[in-house]
Amino acid sequence: VIRCVGNPDRRFNEDALRMLRAYRFCAKLGFSMDETVKTSIDTNASLIQYVSIERIVHELKEIMETNPQVLADMTLLLKPVFNELDLALRCSQNSIYHYTDVLHHTLDAMCYLKPYDETLAFALLFHDLGKVQVKTTDSNGKDHFKHHAKVGSELSKELCRRFKLTNEQRKWIPFYVLHHDDKFTCDLDCIYKYRVTYHLDEEHLLNLLQIRYCDAMAHSEL
């Protein structure tokens, strides 16, 4: 069980990053969190805005690699720096293709990423965030998310800058988000389009296919 030494409020006011570390220990070690610690984190969540983004992203990466599902419990804590997660949690998907909200679909998709790759993990984390902005509901109550990949790609550019990711990641993450929902067929014409039109080498084409696989595995069985 994750506990604080002494008063949790005092510990988190000394260094707000400790709130993220508590979740990281839960993710890496499989521990549960003491209720007083969880309550204190919820109370002091706004303090995270005073922590440098580099320190926050370092902890975020550790959680993404070990157990991304923990992020579902961190939306309030991350809200000052990554409000998009909370919006995704609140974005339901009443569709034959989905069984859960945008955030839980995203985290489920990330769990299929084997072996782990940091760039692809961020691409998966960002891939459906555009749905929040484009969601519509038809007369039958079914939800639609037209052009979410394009909107999400633009949003991912901003997130890459906000999180100070590498130049290589800033180049490829928005590309993967933009094309994650493309209609793809395993024929020469389709492969030619990606290899020539988008100048993809084998590595990046396989990366895109891996993202599509993870996304597909986190969909409903039709």
Predicted regions and their residues:
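Divalent metal-dependent catalytic cores for phosphoryl transfer on phosphate-bearing substrates
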Residues: 112-221
